[in-house]
Curated annotation (Swiss-Prot):
Pfam families: COX1 (PF00115). Fe(II)-heme a binds at H61, H378. Its main location: mitochondrion. Mg(2+) binds at H368, D369. It comes from Myxine glutinosa (Atlantic hagfish). Its cofactor is heme; Cu cation. This is Cytochrome c oxidase subunit 1. It is a multi-pass membrane protein. The gene is MT-CO1. Binds 2 heme A groups non-covalently per subunit. GO terms for biological process: electron transport coupled proton transport; mitochondrial electron transport, cytochrome c to oxygen.
Amino acid sequence: MYLSRWFFSTNHKDIGTLYLIFGAWAGMIGTALSVIIRTELSQPGSLINNDQLYNTIITAHAFVMIFFMVMPIMIGGFGNWLVPMMIGAPDMAFPRMNNMSFWLLPPSLMLLLSSSLVSSGAGTGWTVYPPLSNHISHMGPSVDLAIFSLHLAGVSSILGAINFITTIINMKTRSMEMYHIPLFVWSILITAILLLLSLPVLAAAITMLLTDRNLNTTFFDPSGGGDPILYQHLFWFFGHPEVYILILPGFGIISHVVTFYSGKKEPFGYMGMAWAMMAIGFLGFIVWAHHMFTVGMDVDTRAYFTSATMIIAIPTGVKVFSWLATIHGGDIKWEPPMLWALGFIFLFTVGGLTGIVLSNSSLDVVLHDTYYVVAHFHYVLSMGAVFAIMAGLMHWFPLFSGYSINKTWAKIHFWIMFTGVNLTFFPQHFLGLAGMPRRYSDYPDAYSTWNVLSSIGSMVSFVGTIILMFIIWEAFSSKREPNPLSLPLYNPEWIYGTPPTFHTFENPSYLKIIKKE
């Protein structure tokens, strides 16, 4: 019974729970790796005494956080749990494929971790650029294992994407049109489309890299008529949509959290929010070369990618101001999910502003591969995606588990994390402006002050992570029932109680639209 429930599950709630547990586990690995990085950089001089190992840790940190923490939790965890319940579907369209999507991830993570343990590890950075990643600069099977790991994670995501697209389009309850589905469902749909269109390009790129390494092809080797810049174009055609894949489900989560804790019955500008996500998804595919301003492109090409990148700020601004308008005039409940959501809006906006700075090709030539870029993407990931995950976890925890979180501890956790991540990443803007490059294990003494502060912030965040583990343990051990009056019972995912029954919407459900004149 136990084996068949958890290993052969076809229930979207159980698979969502597996994804959440897997993501939490991977998140702890990724956090441990980041603490090693910040410890190495906590003062001038060397700690690890091995730059190849340092770069391997950086590469693993990126892959683990992106493919095994953020994506499984947001798309696999929240997506599986909530999408069928929000559209009144009994389950996902392809329940067994859903199970396979999950079970491809643990082997993928094992391959990635084993790539660090054999030979000298894959010290390529998460971009895996040739010629650094070719068979000459990286001998041994490490990069090949990392490539196979990416293949498995990619297949998992593509299957999941097909499943979500089919479910959302075909399994909505009768009379529910696209413009009735909640914003979180919109965000998962757009994310799934982005995955479906971008991952095959990554698969092509890393497969060509694999044959370059092992079968003597020269796709990316100039000596045989290839071009390493081709790899960069292929990688970033996936890589840029990928960063929107990481943040879009967060947008959906924040829309739900902000609406409920502002005492509103719907978010401000529903249609604008949905169209803004579609615009972000579309624009995300036509700006990839802004990651490549330093490889030598024509001035016209640079002008196009600069302006196209800046245009993404418009739909993003629509979303930020719609969240603020949702809060405006509301009866705000200052509970942990709302704190995370407000932190998200503020810090994601800061990250967006540094993104506008970097979109200028002339400025990016100076700032490329410095800590300014690290600060920028950690503001949108470590304080965008992660804050959104935390907002969603605190908000839907009673739904997933049937127990309530201790609000005092949750608020303490928020303030510790808020302090920690800002102390970690804000000084990195100054380091980048002063010219400190990325992916180096040591630095001149002039950079030590900001690095010390940054590493202290990392320790603060680490304490916050330990407190989160305590909070979740405390909730399960205390077994407090959530107060039904404090739950958003008029939202479809909550109508089956906390936790919901194993099967929901077993009979066809019906949606009645009340049009208010």
